[in-house]
Amino acid sequence: GPAMRAAHEAVLAAENPVRRGLQPAPAHFLGRQADVAEVLKALSTHRLVTLTGPGGVGKTTLAQVVAARSRRPAVYVVGLAEIAPGADVVRAVLDALGRPAPGDGDPYRSLSGALAQPGTVLVLDNCEHLVDPVAGLIGRLLTTCPDLRILATSRRALDLAAEHVHRLEPLDAASADRLFRARALAARPGQVIDDRELKDLLRRLDGIPLAIEL
């Protein structure tokens, strides 16, 4: 019956995991292990988890690491940064999944079909400029695909009833110091870093990883 078929499909998926849109692991990923563990745990108990925080705080990197460490059979990562406000979000996500929208059919049906297999995780990265259409799409997907889990990243929450918000804070002083030294020494091995100057610089950078790496 359908239940037996679904169980069989789940076993097959576990043996042949699907991974799309994942980036190589970052060379220097410091001070975020607790966040990774908390987000993975949240995804096991909530169907929608949104990573929020200011630009450059590391939401995309954290989402990529969480996606890579997920044990669910199908994980799709879709970056929305280049999608213009007003664009068709359904078609944009379909394209990112490698499943072009049908010429005459319903693109949403194609998308929900692609995401309906048991144990699927969809990561929607950089949602802040598309909050309304993305929230609308997520609401539909959570209804249509009962086993789908969604991880979104956005500078602000999506304000959906199912949403669990994980706010990503700037790095603590020790992690910021380690990140700067690791990146600086990778760029110029052997250079001497003045501790006092570094402390002053890091205080101005407010623990924002993107600023530290630049």
Give each language-model segment a name.
Residues G1, A87-V90, V134-A135:
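Conserved strand-to-helix beginnings and helix N-cap segments that scaffold or border functional pockets
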Residues L97-P107, D147, R156-D206, A211-I212:
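Helix-loop-helix "sensor" segment of P-loop NTPases
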Residues A67-P73, R109-S175, R181-A182:
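A conserved switch/coupling segment of P-loop NTPase cores
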Residues R32, K59-T60, L205-I208:
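Short, conserved phosphate/pyrophosphate- and ester-handling motifs at nucleotide-, phospho-/glycolipid
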Residues A25-V39:
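N-terminal pre-P-loop "Q-motif" helix
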Residues G1-P24:
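Intrinsically disordered, charged and Pro/Gly-enriched terminal/linker segments
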Residues A37-A42, R47-V57, T61-P118:
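Post-nucleotide-binding-loop coupling segment downstream of the phosphate-binding loop, primarily
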